[in-house]
Amino acid sequence: HMTWRDCAVPHPEVATAYTAHVMDCMGEIESALGNENEAQSYRAFAAGCRKSYQALCRTEEYSLDTDRQARLVHPLAFGLLEKTQTEYAQKRLLHALEHFNWRVGMVFCRRR
């Protein structure tokens, strides 16, 4: 059940994941334009987001020990995790998929 707070107060794990991804994209754009100083600034910001995400995943509230597929797919797709976290998230995602009979449960993936 969604409330107004779901839109007004972003989930920190989602906001951090997408911020890291956007900063990586901006770094690529600046690099392609020949603006290496700006590209490096974006890459550094993205690296900080990844470290923040890794720390967030070590907390109980945002643990990778979940059946929530989005919480496992985002960090894997965006390369946000440390090696051990990545290995755990991959195994945990397989477990989550088995638990849901291999149904994709992420809302944005089901939309047309």
Q: Predicted segment positions?
A:
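Active-site core of glycosidic bond-cleaving carbohydrate-active enzymes
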Residues: 1-112
